[in-house]
């Protein structure tokens, strides 16, 4: 209420305390109570990892919007999926080729923004999220952690996804 009275046009509520950090579950009941106590839009955040989680938060808390955090790591298309899901549209599963193309674009943008040395090191963690749950992810992750050049990283990922395509088909 204090924030609303101070002139805020919206409030984002993360259903965890600083002490809880990433442990346990976000307190959606608290988010719902905030929504019920103010007239300005409330955006709920916490434990949104799937399109179904987003719908569930909307239904359970009556928030005006949802914010996705860690659920977007390695899964940036979650935003498209949520919108399509909420609109009742068919959700097209992302292919491994599309995933590779997104990773390569991510690498290019990161290198352009931060330079090769910093970007390749930072991309290691992002790639780990992208390939999570894919076959041989641990092996490829170990290889990627030794790479410090963009062209080597691109070649490694391309080879991995080509092998993946052959194994699947």
Regions found by a protein language model. Name each.
Residues 13-23:
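Glycine-rich, proline-tolerant flexible connector loops at the mouths of alpha/beta enzymes
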Residues 1-10, 22, 29, 33-44, ...:
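Alpha/beta catalytic cores of nucleotide-metabolism and tRNA/nucleoside-modifying enzymes
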């Amino acid at each position: 209420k204090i924030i609303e009275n101070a002139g805020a046009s919206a409030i984002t509520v993360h259903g965890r305390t600083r002490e809880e950090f990433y442990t346990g579950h976000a307190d959606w009941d608290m988010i719902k109570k905030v929504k019920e106590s103010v007239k300005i839009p409330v955006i709920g955040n916490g434990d949104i990892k799937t399109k179904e989680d987003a719908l569930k938060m909307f239904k359970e808390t009556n928030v005006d919007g949802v914010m996705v955090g860690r659920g977007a790591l390695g899964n940036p298309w979650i935003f498209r999926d949520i919108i399509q899901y909420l609109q009742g549209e068919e959700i097209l599963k992302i292919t491994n080729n599309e995933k590779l193309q997104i990773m390569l674009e991510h690498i290019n943008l990161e290198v352009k923004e931060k330079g090769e040395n910093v970007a390749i090191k930072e991309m290691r963690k992002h790639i780990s999220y992208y390939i999570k749950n894919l076959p041989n992810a641990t092996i490829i992750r170990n290889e990627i952690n030794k790479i410090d050049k963009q062209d080597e990283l691109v070649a490694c990922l391309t080879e991995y996804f080509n092998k993946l395509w052959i194994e699947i088909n």
